[in-house]
């Protein structure tokens, strides 16, 4: 193993350990991590980064699914939303990609407000997204089983 390979592995191990902190003690993350790590054979953070570098090209649409609505208040959760927006910005800055956030309709307003904070312009029309710089899309999905086939 070269010094660069060792450094990459150690950075990945540290990032994976950080992302597997489980302050609530659910244990689910560690179970899912173990299976995923066995599948990839390397730190998941570095594996994901390499897959993105290999796959994402300029102007590619990259779909990011996020968000759920907290009941009974009907407000969107925000930790996944914020993380998704930061990923969207990183994809634009690193690759010139065109991220599209796919979320429940109740989360669209939060996504739109976060877009401005991360310096991106947001549109529902993906044709517009593909023609403008620093832009991203948002696509709401229905929670209605009856409406889902039409969407």
List the predicted regions and their residue ranges:
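A general structural motif
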Residues: 59-61, 96, 149-150
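Acidic, glycine-rich active-site loops and adjacent beta-strand->loop/helix elements
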Residues: 68-70, 105-109
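Short, charged beta->alpha transition segments
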Residues: 45-55, 87, 113, 140-145
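Positively charged, low-complexity intrinsically disordered leader regions
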Residues: 1-61
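Histidine-anchored nucleotide/phosphate-binding helix
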Residues: 77-96
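Short, glycine-rich nucleotide/cofactor-binding loops
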Residues: 36-42, 61-62, 66-83
């Amino acid at each position: 193993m070269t010094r660069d390979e060792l450094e990459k592995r150690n950075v990945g191990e540290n990032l994976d350990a950080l992302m597997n902190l489980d302050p609530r003690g659910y244990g689910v993350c560690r179970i899912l991590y173990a299976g995923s790590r066995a599948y990839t054979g390397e730190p998941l953070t570095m594996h994901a980064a390499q897959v993105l570098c290999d796959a994402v090209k300029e102007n590619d649409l990259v779909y990011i699914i996020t968000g759920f609505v907290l009941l009974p208040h009907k407000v969107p959760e925000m930790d996944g939303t914020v993380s998704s927006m930061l990923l969207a910005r990183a994809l634009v800055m690193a690759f010139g990609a065109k991220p599209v956030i796919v979320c429940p309709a109740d989360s669209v307003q939060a996504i739109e407000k976060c877009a401005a904070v991360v310096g991106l312009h947001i549109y529902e029309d993906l044709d517009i997204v593909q023609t403008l710089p620093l832009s991203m899309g948002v696509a709401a999905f229905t929670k209605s089983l009856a409406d889902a086939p039409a969407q």
